[in-house]
Amino acid sequence: MKTIHLGIGGPVGSGKTTLVKTLSEALKEEYSIAVITNDIYTREDANFLINENILEKDRIIGVETGGCPHTAIREDASMNFEAIEELKNRFDDLEIILLESGGDNLSATFSPELVDAFIYVIDVSEGGDIPRKGGPGVTRSDFLMVNKTELAPYVGVDLDTMKNDTIKARNGRPFTFANIKTKKGLDEIIAWIKSDLLLEGKTNESASESK
């Protein structure tokens, strides 16, 4: 089986690492999983996941990009390719690698050579107009997670308006409104991973059409 490389991107503080943690906890009993995190000067996110005992330590690699976060996932992804190769050497049965980018702006996207698909994470506290502002992460990511919906009343965001704007921005692409700390929205993301990436429940003919 081909190892699925799933990117997770979004601005600083939007909930990327929490999503990685929650997905790993939910999927690790069913699939062989590993994680790569990207930080500019530290391995803070990797250390957090290790300390939380989400996965075995050897299944988590922290990459220090030393520069613009989006460069390491697009223009020069060599460090991440090396990390992928290292994980596959350690575990020859890997089914899913979650690859978290460093925090970046709305223009960041993953190289299609690096990942098979990517989830983009924004949060309500950044403003209800984020979907209208667009950007490649919002409009072209394979799945969009609008996180921290519980904060809407405190930051003056009308969720109904934000959802309508998201529908327009996504143009049919999948998304969910979530509070990932409480696992709200998690089921939709997992269902998408299983159906669209792992192609579970699809016939050979329909799976071929999806590739």
UniProtKB/Swiss-Prot annotation:
It is found in: Cytoplasm. It holds the Pfam family cobW. Keywords: Chaperone, Cytoplasm, Disulfide bond, GTP-binding, Nickel insertion, Nucleotide-binding. It comes from the Bacteria. One of its GO terms (molecular function) is protein homodimerization activity. GTP binds at G10, P11, V12, G13, S14, G15, K16, T17. GO terms for cellular component: cytoplasm. Belongs to the SIMIBI class G3E GTPase family. UreG subfamily. Homodimer; disulfide-linked. The physiological role of the disulfide bond has not been proven in vivo. UreD, UreF and UreG form a complex that acts as a GTP-hydrolysis-dependent molecular chaperone, activating the urease apoprotein by helping to assemble the nickel-containing metallocenter. Exists in a relatively unstructured form; binding to the other subunits (UreD, UreF and apourease) may induce correct protein folding. The presence of Zn2(+) or GTP does not alter the unfolded state. PANTHER family: UREASE ACCESSORY PROTEIN G. HAMAP family: UreG (MF_01389). This is Urease accessory protein UreG. The lineage of its organism: Bacteria, Bacillati, Bacillota, Bacilli, Bacillales. The gene is ureG.
